[in-house]
């Protein structure tokens, strides 16, 4: 049995130039693995604690405390442990070494979710190498998933909300090549639509409008949300993929929810007169009008993270034709997932490992979601690294969907390219989720 001999953390930088945590693990049989954690821009208030240093260095965003917690507390406690025992190691870190809890479970406020997760990811990678199997297969084994499926990529090609400097309230407009026969073909479709979209935007809004945002998407000076959908529809048509490439949205509505329980579609305009503030019901009806007019299959965070009422209404009214994805609502937290299942608040989980802070808890949230008949979309964060763990995670858990940005910017392509490698490695056994992206496998 190989055991952990070294756990070493350092501060590196994410794709936005902000510090983040990277961890190396060495084992007794000479293996060395490295894992790095991402960070988000629009973060849900219920996410586990991302520990930052504060102060003036790096504008308060340094992670030397989290790095110190790995090097001085977590690391020494893991020496001699077997890296294949993921659940035991995660539970030891979360319950014993950290031990902080709030009403939603283990909140990692002592050591930081970024410290614990970096180690959890590295342990998972080490466990795979020690077991002599690919990472995706190791993850499938940890979850008890017998059938591996490649996900449909959801490319975020138009950016608004907190990710962009335009007037657009809604944060992401995505394309999903569900009509492809393989992941490789899905990449081809996505890339071609992306380039057609670039031409359409350049022609309509000028060269500057094709500058890319944090996730590689375009942020043209669009005034309203329907304009974004219209651009996607045009680009899909020009690429010749009408019916094969469909649309998803991430509204990130918590970003424009007001104290008075209204949603301000003009929230980015300073000193605005409130003329575009609408009720939750009016916003729901706006989504329904979009769904009637465009090939929309997925809407993420359509309401505020505490607006359980409108989530449930929306899921009841359109949940069969559209997946209603909980991100800020659920924050990959098993307790919040359980509440949403009980209240029928949504019907899909957005899986972000750094919202909850360990591989084991992420697997638990996915298994609960699948048992409830939900879809699962694996996701990056807007501040990413070159780490490709989530590509293997999406395959190993057969989530059926992954969003990790546009087919642009190396930290995004790193994940898509890893999925191409995995598909090639699986050969004739490779299955692409395609139109079954919401339920690619039976619950495991």
Swiss-Prot record:
Binding residues for substrate: 163, 172, 300, 327, 379-382, 403
* EC number(s) given by UniProt: 4.2.1.11
Q: How is the cofactor bound?
A: Mg(2+) is required for catalysis and for stabilizing the dimer.
Its cofactor is: Mg(2+)
Recorded hits in InterPro entries, A to Z, give: Enolase, Enolase-like_C_sf, Enolase-like_N, Enolase_C, Enolase_CS, Enolase_N
| Coiled-coil regions listed in the entry | none
On subunit structure and binding partners, the annotation says: Homodimer.
Q: What does this protein do?
A: Multifunctional enzyme that acts as an enolase involved in the metabolism and as a positive regulator of cold-responsive gene transcription. Binds to the cis-element the gene promoter of STZ/ZAT10, a zinc finger transcriptional repressor.
* Assigned protein family: Belongs to the enolase family.
Indicate what this protein is called per its UniProt record.
Answer: Bifunctional enolase 2/transcriptional activator
Task: Specify the species.
Answer: Arabidopsis thaliana
């Amino acid at each position: 049995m190989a055991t952990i001999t070294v756990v070493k953390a350092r501060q590196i930088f994410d794709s936005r130039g902000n510090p983040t945590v990277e961890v190396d693990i060495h084992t007794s049989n000479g293996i060395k693995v490295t894992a790095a954690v991402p960070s988000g821009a629009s973060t849900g208030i219920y996410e586990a604690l991302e520990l930052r240093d504060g102060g003036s260095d790096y504008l308060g965003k340094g992670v030397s405390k989290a790095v110190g917690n790995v090097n001085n507390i977590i690391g020494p406690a893991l020496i001699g442990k077997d890296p294949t025992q993921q659940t035991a190691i995660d539970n030891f870190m979360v319950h014993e070494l950290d031990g902080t809890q709030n009403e939603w479970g283990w909140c990692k406020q002592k050591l930081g979710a970024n410290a614990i997760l970096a180690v959890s990811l590295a342990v998972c990678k080490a466990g795979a190498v020690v077991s002599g199997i690919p990472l995706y297969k190791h993850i499938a084994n940890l979850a008890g998933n017998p059938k591996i499926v490649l996900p449909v990529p959801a490319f975020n090609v138009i950016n608004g909300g907190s990710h962009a400097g335009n007037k657009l309230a809604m944060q992401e407009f995505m394309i999903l090549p569900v009509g492809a026969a393989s992941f490789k073909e899905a990449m081809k479709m996505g890339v071609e639509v992306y380039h057609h979209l670039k031409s359409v935007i350049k022609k309509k809004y000028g060269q500057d409008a094709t500058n890319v945002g944090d996730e590689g998407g375009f942020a043209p000076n669009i005034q309203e949300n329907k304009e974004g959908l219209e651009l996607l529809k045009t680009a899909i048509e020009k690429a010749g993929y009408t019916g094969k490439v469909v649309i998803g949205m991430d509204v990130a509505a918590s970003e424009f929810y007001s104290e008075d329980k209204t949603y301000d579609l003009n929230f980015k305009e300073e000193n605005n007169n409130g003329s575009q503030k609408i009720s939750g019901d009016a916003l729901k009806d706006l989504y329904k009008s979009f769904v009637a007019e465009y090939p929309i299959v997925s809407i993420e965070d359509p309401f505020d993270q505490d607006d359980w009422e409108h989530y449930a209404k929306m899921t009841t009214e359109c949940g069969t034709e559209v997946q209603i994805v909980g991100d800020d609502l659920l924050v990959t937290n098993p307790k919040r997932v359980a509440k949403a299942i009980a209240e029928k608040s949504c019907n899909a989980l957005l899986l972000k490992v750094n919202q909850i802070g360990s591989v084991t808890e992420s697997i638990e949230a996915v298994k609960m979601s699948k048992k409830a008949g939900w879809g699962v979309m694996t996701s990056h964060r807007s501040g990413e690294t070159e780490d490709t763990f989530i590509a293997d995670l999406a395959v190993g858990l057969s989530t059926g969907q992954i969003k990790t940005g546009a087919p642009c910017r190396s930290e995004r392509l790193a994940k898509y390219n890893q999925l191409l490698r995995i598909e090639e490695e699986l050969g004739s056994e490779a299955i692409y989720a395609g139109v079954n992206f919401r339920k690619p496998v039976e619950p495991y």
